Amino acid sequence: MKYPKEYLNEIKLRLKVSQVVSKSVQLKKRGKEFIGLSPFKNEKSPSFTVNDEKEFYHCFSSGEHGNIFDFLMKTKSIGFGEAVKILAAEAGMQPYRFSYNLRN
């Protein structure tokens, strides 16, 4: 089942990438971006950046890159549907209800 783009966009509108990422990565503001230690690699110098304006994160040490859904899927080892449910709840939205068309 596919989620409608409008539903996913509403989640992204309500939640900043830094808001989601900062629950597992300590971030520091640097200009328009945030930086922190990579959640994907064991590192001593921060190479992980978050850009709320462009709605993505990027890890220069591992090459990982994505949006809030990708981040949850990769850091929590969950599927897309589960990430959508978690983020929708965090955004104060109702879970999406798929409608099924039954054909005779």
Task: Describe the role of every protein-language-model region.
Residues 1-100:
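N-terminal structured subdomain of primase-like DNA metabolism proteins
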